[in-house]
Amino acid sequence: FRPALAAAPRRISPGLRVNPDYAEVAVALYNPCAPGSRLGIRRAQFEGESLAGIEGLHFHCLCEQDADVLERVLARVEEQFAPFFGGLRWINFGGGHHITRPGYDVDRLVRIVAGFRARYPHLQVVLEPGEAVALHTGWLVASVLDIVEADLPVAILDTSAEAHMPDVLAMPYRPEVEGAGKPGEKAWTCRLAGLTCLAGDTIGTYSFDAPLQVGDRVVFADM
């Protein structure tokens, strides 16, 4: 990429993504440091002499996590890559920080960043809050198209897990539904499903105070 950088019409500060082979992400699909991950250069393949012109390092090892996990990840990053910090200008701590989530330990994050800056005062620290910027800011409003009887009543909605909320199928992830509870928690339990031909286009099982009817609105929070 060096020829492309040299030919760029504006100045670019190039960096490399590194992989410290350490993360605490429970779902393998979202774990950038899982065995066999293609994301980031591992220490064993890291050649210091190849850093000419490189101004920063980037690591992304978190997924919806708190500052305590960042602290442990950062310790691994320093252990492996600190010898290369001297010639750099910046380091990017990546995303996955749930900074705006209630209960997030902001004071601990401040201490972590301040401590790192004290150890490496020449490095600018970059954070990518990612999802935290938009946490709890959007809703998806669906309507009930039909009720199908199976082992449980199935409410067919005019939305789709596959098309509109793929994390439901990938993680799996259970979206929050306004006014709904866990299965059996409220008077009527049903399965919410999409309208596609995918057999597994199922959003989850929820309970409601009263049976859903065709035309009722179902509001998914934190979309």
Regions found by a protein language model. Name each.
Residues I112, Q124-M223:
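Charged (often Lys/Glu-rich) extended helix/loop segments that serve as interaction or gating elements
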Residues W90-N92, H98, L109-V133:
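Oxyanion-binding "anion nests"
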Residues H58-C61, L88-G94, G194-T196, D216, ...:
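Glycine-rich anion-binding loop/nest that anchors nucleotide
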Residues D21, P35, L62, H98, ...:
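Residue-level marker of positions within ordered structural domains that often coincide
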Residues A28-N31, G56-F59, G95, V126, ...:
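Generic, low-specificity signal for short hydrophobic/alpha-helical stretches with a mild N-terminal bias
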Residues R17-D21, G96, S160, L195:
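Generic beta-structure capping elements
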Residues A23-E24, C63-D66, H98-R101, V133-H136, ...:
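Flexible loop/turn segments at secondary-structure boundaries
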Residues F1-N92, G103-D105, I112-G115, R119, ...:
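Active-site-proximal beta-alpha core segment in soluble small-molecule metabolic enzymes
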